[in-house]
Amino acid sequence: MSRIGLRPIEIPQGVEVKIDEKNFAVVKGPKGTLEQQLSKDMEIKIEENVINVVRPTDNKKHKSLHGLTRTLLSNMVEGVTKGYEKKLELVGVGYRANKQGDKLVLTLGFSHPIEMVDPEGITVEVPSQTEIFVKGINKQVVGNYAAKIRELRKPEPYKGKGVKYANEVIRRKVGKTGK
C-alpha cells in the first residue's frame, strides 16, 4: 500500500500557494503560475510552510485520490521552482530536428518534413540536429508534448532508428537469418 499522500509538501521560499474552499489550487513561483482543480473530497491544509492532504475516510476511492492530490500539488510546487525537462534523441540516417520561430521542424524519413507548433508554456530547444529539449513548468504538458514528438517515429527494435527519450533503453531483436 502506498503512503505517498501522508507525506507533507514543503513550500520553498518565494512560492505562494492558495487553495480555495472548492480545492482550486493556484501556485505562484519564480518560474510562473500554475492553476489546477483538485479533488473536492480531499481536505488540504496549509500550515506555515507545509501543505498536508487529509482524506475523509479510508475507502478505496479516497485512498487513491489522497496520493494523487498530494502528487499533483507536489508537481505544481516543483514546477514553479525548478521546472521540468525531457530530452529526446533522434537516431537514424537523415533524421534531423531544427527550430523555426515557435515551430519544431522534424525530418524523420517521410516524404515531407513535419512541423509542430510549440504549446503555450513550453519551450523547445534544439542544441544539435539530433537532440531536442522540451522544457516547461507543467509536468503533464511537458510529458505529453515529448510523447507526441516520440509518437511520430517510435524507435524500432531491429536497428533502433527513431525518436527516443535520452534515458530510454530499446530492446533489440535479432533479424532473420538467411539459409
Swiss-Prot record:
Domain of life of the source: Bacteria
GO cellular component, one term: cytosolic large ribosomal subunit
GO molecular function: rRNA binding; structural constituent of ribosome
Gene3D superfamilies given in the database record: Ribosomal protein L6, alpha-beta domain
Entry annotated with the keyword Ribosomal protein: yes
Cross-referenced PROSITE patterns: RIBOSOMAL_L6_1 (PS00525)
Gene Ontology BP terms: cytoplasmic translation
Coiled coil: none
Assigned keywords, A-Z: Ribonucleoprotein, Ribosomal protein, RNA-binding, rRNA-binding
Pfam families noted in UniProt: Ribosomal_L6
InterPro entries for the chain: Ribosomal_uL6-like (IPR000702), Ribosomal_uL6-like_a/b-dom_sf (IPR036789), Ribosomal_uL6_a/b-dom (IPR020040), Ribosomal_uL6_bac-type (IPR019906), Ribosomal_uL6_CS (IPR002358)
Family to which this protein belongs: Belongs to the universal ribosomal protein uL6 family.
NCBIfam families reported for this sequence: L6_bact (TIGR03654)
Entry-linked HAMAP family: Ribosomal_uL6_B
Protein function: This protein binds to the 23S rRNA, and is important in its secondary structure. It is located near the subunit interface in the base of the L7/L12 stalk, and near the tRNA binding site of the peptidyltransferase center.
Subunit comment: Part of the 50S ribosomal subunit.
Protein name, per record: Large ribosomal subunit protein uL6
Organism: Alkaliphilus oremlandii (strain OhILAs) (Clostridium oremlandii (strain OhILAs))
